[in-house]
Amino acid sequence: MIVSFSPPIDYEVAGNRLRLLPGGLERFETLIDTIEAAQESIRVLFYMFTEDAAGTRVLHALTQAAARGVEVRVLLDEFGCGAIRPAFLDPLRDAGGMYCVFHPTISRRYLIRNHQKMVVVDGRRAIIGGANINEHYLTDEGPKHWRDLWLFIDGPAVEKLADYFDDIYLWTAHPKPLVKKLRRIIAKHSRGSGPIAWRFSGPIANSNPWPVQVVKDILAARRVDIVAAYFSPSNAMLRRIGGVVERGGEARLVTASKSDNNATIAAARFTYGRLLKRGVRVFEYQPAKLHTKLYICDDAVHIGSANFDFRSLYLNLEMMLRVEDRAFAQAMRDYVDGEVANSMEITPAVHKSKATLWRKTKWALSNFLVTTMDYTVTRRINLGQE
């Protein structure tokens, strides 16, 4: 059973209303309501948009919006949306909507994925987070449903996200998009500061805006909470997280015990020993598959599309919103407490009992695979459940 939290997380920060959407049905209803309320424009970007009941309903709402004169633009990642039939999107195009696909599969930029998730309506309201357009992300029932988060934003911060979408859309639609131009777009739109700031990441070596920001926040923090569906960062990042405890602070990690990709679970378990040795508390979420991406460093909250692994930190296109507000951070930490209550703690003794030679070998191999391959590729590699 999933433990709910109270009161609801619905805050105003710097003139922006922020409302957390932890429930799948709540996400679905909010998405449809937001699309149906659009008057001028709808910008949609998703890594995965599937041709199931949820995807069909969302496409219908977008098609209706286009038919009533709303400018609708949809940007999808070809690898994540590879199962969609071209004819599925025809009604949207016929109604006057537009769409394009990020990154042809056969390309010298094969490893880069547009892993972002966002809906921007009228340049004023937005939905961001980790959930894709798929029936298992937009429900709270069934063995295949995902535990995830979206954040609804209503306020001036959305205008910057709309501008970012426009630049990414134009870059994707260009017949010969250059990676160096993409890097400039990411850097340009990550320059803001203040209580609410956007941080993006992509194929940028050592100056990737979101990783740079989250490292800075971790190094300054006395308390860090990480809820990450996929967790396989570098040894340097593990040392930084452990350093929070070593200097007298607290650090918790909540990651998945269930997934449709067993390699990602094994890869996370490869990191546990280093974290536990430094005093980090580690938990595995039990009731459902976990897909959340939430990071809290003292009063700074990071929420968006990025996992805490190599691909999200240094390769994929990702978007994160950084909110620095004490009350909001405490509310989000209370939310994490609820996730911890539904998790099993992996103590040093528990980890030691599981860390057989065979398992450690499998964990190490999985860590290598998820670092070098796309999620949809490693999902097809059957390493078996433990």
Specify the residue positions occupied by each region the protein language model found.
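Charged, low-complexity intrinsically disordered terminal segments
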Residues: 1-386
